[in-house]
């Protein structure tokens, strides 16, 4: 019944202002005992995470900006159960992945991070991003800050739409917002904070961010190293960036052979567009 009311509310309110939620689904419930077992399996030191709450794990489909249109993407929403005080909204940005379903709302280790943080009393959100997860876009625009930031921001909007309307979600959101991420997620964390500050400060007030091990100076330190002639341990990241940016800015080049020599120009479409290979495999092919 509540789901029907949510859909009716959604249809009414779309005539007033744009909603971003398309649908959402409860994937799994984890008890405190389940989460403690997960901590043991992960080999985490005692006391790093102390679960206080069981959690419900949802997959959310929502709309986000991609180039000059809106597209449907997916993300995880993990909600603590039986909280007696308001919970902060905490957005986790995942690390680099090239496999379509190696993302938080599906079966990846990134999902476990969301579960652990939610068990300590956070509503944890984790965007899968354009081109990954449920997205039908054939390539993730890797490291494109505007696109990645909006995937995170729109998932926060979706959570604010869903949580007050679903009687099965017994948590109230506080005014606190935390952003954190690792690797690509560290960079996305910075982009998200910047976009919120510049464009959406009337809608969101970020309490704190924790960007970890991100690429923060692509046009400086990264470019200098690439041009230095030194061996690069993860060469697959370079075509991922170039091809991802070309998907946003098609004028960058017409053909991969304009940028890459053979056999790489012929190899990269299969490696990246198919979403079948992880970055370890792609790095080995480069």
For the regions a language model picked out, list residue spans one by one.
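Catalytic-loop region of hydrolases
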Residues: 19-85
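Alpha/beta-hydrolase active-site loop
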Residues: 142-166
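Gly/Ala-rich beta-loop-alpha elbow adjacent to hydrolase catalytic centers
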Residues: 181-185, 189
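A conserved short beta-strand
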Residues: 202-213
């Amino acid at each position: 019944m509540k789901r029907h009311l949510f859909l009716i509310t959604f249809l009414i309110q779309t005539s007033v202002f744009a909603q971003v939620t398309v649908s959402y689904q409860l994937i799994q419930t984890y008890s405190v005992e389940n989460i403690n077992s997960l901590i043991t399996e992960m080999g985490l030191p005692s006391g790093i995470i102390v679960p206080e709450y069981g959690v419900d794990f949802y997959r959310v489909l929502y709309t986000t900006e991609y180039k000059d249109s809106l597209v449907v993407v997916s993300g995880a929403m993990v909600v603590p159960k039986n909280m007696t005080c308001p919970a902060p909204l905490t957005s986790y940005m995942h690390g680099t992945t090239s496999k379509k379903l190696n993302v938080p709302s599906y079966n990846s280790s990134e999902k476990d991070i969301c579960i652990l943080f939610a068990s300590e009393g956070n509503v944890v959100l984790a965007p899968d991003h354009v081109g990954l997860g449920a997205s039908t876009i054939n390539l993730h625009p890797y490291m494109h800050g505007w696109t990645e930031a909006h995937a995170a921001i729109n998932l926060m909007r979706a959570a604010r739409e869903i949580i007050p309307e679903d009687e099965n979600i017994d948590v109230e959101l506080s005014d606190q917002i935390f952003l954190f991420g690792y690797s690509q997620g560290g960079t996305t964390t910075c982009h998200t904070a910047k976009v919120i500050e510049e464009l959406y400060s009337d809608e969101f007030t970020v309490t704190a961010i924790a960007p970890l091990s991100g690429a923060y100076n692509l046009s400086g330190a990264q470019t200098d190293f690439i041009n230095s002639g030194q061996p690069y341990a993860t060469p697959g990241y370079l075509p991922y960036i170039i091809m991802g940016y070309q998907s946003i800015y098609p004028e960058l080049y017409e053909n991969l052979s304009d940028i890459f020599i053979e056999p790489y120009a012929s190899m990269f479409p299969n490696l990246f567009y198919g979403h079948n290979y992880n970055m370890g495999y792609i790095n080995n092919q480069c």
